[in-house]
């Protein structure tokens, strides 16, 4: 915190609480125009650091702020990084690991510089304002155990939807302040004829392309009120797509034999066009992008 009537500050940082000046790793660091100092190279994981700041006023009189300390946690990723200097761009890379329940940030050199720690936060996407969106894993005992969230480095979870659906791939904040996400929906459908037919018939299904007997999983776009978290608008593929249009070539019905449900649409992105008041839905298993009128 800034001290009044001071013109500049000098920072010392050490791992030795008894001799911060003499055993410093950041020594006599001059800080004037900003109260922010970013050290990119000398801070390591699993360490305790001690710091003090000397504030100087216009008369060159000093006042010591501190001593204080902070801890760094443990790294969470276990990766090997190959750096191609001619190809990389400046900046940081944030990613989420869905089945390991964490998010992390790496710098240009592949060094892990932040992670979600003991919060099981999974990064999905960001927006032009730099806000982060994703999901939180809340345990296997919940029916919908990945509620969609907005989160930040500083505060962790800042908003969370009510958890009445499985929110996957995409969630973000609309210009009106509400949140919109990509969930799932289910309906009963046929098992169409194909090379998988004997497999399903061996399980006791008719599998004749006519009998409504098998679980189809589709996608549902959901908008929540930012304050009440009430679902105020939705769009479901089962209300608009023809179930006779499905992928018969990609092996999805063989996967359905093992999982007990047909992954019909498998959407992996939604995008909002404010100028056109429209939502674009990318349905991977239908090889289709759909433009949807938004109220």
Predicted segments with their positions:
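Conserved aromatic anchor
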Residues: 1-4
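Histidine-/acidic-rich catalytic cores in large beta-rich domains
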Residues: 57, 67-295
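Recognizes extended acidic, P/S/T-rich segments that occur
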Residues: 6-46, 58-66
């Amino acid at each position: 915190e800034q001290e009044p009537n001071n013109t500049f500050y000098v920072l010392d940082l050490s791992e030795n609480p008894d001799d911060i000046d003499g055993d410093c790793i950041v020594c006599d660091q001059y800080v004037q125009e900003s109260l922010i100092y970013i050290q990119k190279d000398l801070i390591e994981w699993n360490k305790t650091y001690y710091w003090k700041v000397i504030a100087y006023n216009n008369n060159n009189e000093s006042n010591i702020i501190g001593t204080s300390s902070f801890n760094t946690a443990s790294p969470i990723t276990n990766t090997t990084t190959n750096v191609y200097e001619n190809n990389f761009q400046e900046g940081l890379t944030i990613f989420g690991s869905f089945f390991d329940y964490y998010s992390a940030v790496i710098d240009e050199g592949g060094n892990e510089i932040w992670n979600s720690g003991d919060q099981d936060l999974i990064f999905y996407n960001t927006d032009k304002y730099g806000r982060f969106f994703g999901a939180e894993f809340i345990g296997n005992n919940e029916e919908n155990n990945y509620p969609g969230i907005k989160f930040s480095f500083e505060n962790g979870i800042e908003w969370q939807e009510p958890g009445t659906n499985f929110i996957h791939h995409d969630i973000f904040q609309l210009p009106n302040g509400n949140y919109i996400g990509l969930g799932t929906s289910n309906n009963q459908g046929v098992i169409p004829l194909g090379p998988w037919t004997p497999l399903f018939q061996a399980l006791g299904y008719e599998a004749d392309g006519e009998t409504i007997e098998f679980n189809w999983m589709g996608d549902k776009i959901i908008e929540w009120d930012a304050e009440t978290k009430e679902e105020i608008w939705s769009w479901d593929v089962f209300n608009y797509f023809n179930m006779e249009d499905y992928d018969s070539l990609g092996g999805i019905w063989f996967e359905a034999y093992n999982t007990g449900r047909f992954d019909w649409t498998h959407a992996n992105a939604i995008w909002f066009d404010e100028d056109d008041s429209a939502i674009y839905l990318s349905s991977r298993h239908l090889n289709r992008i759909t433009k949807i009128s938004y109220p």
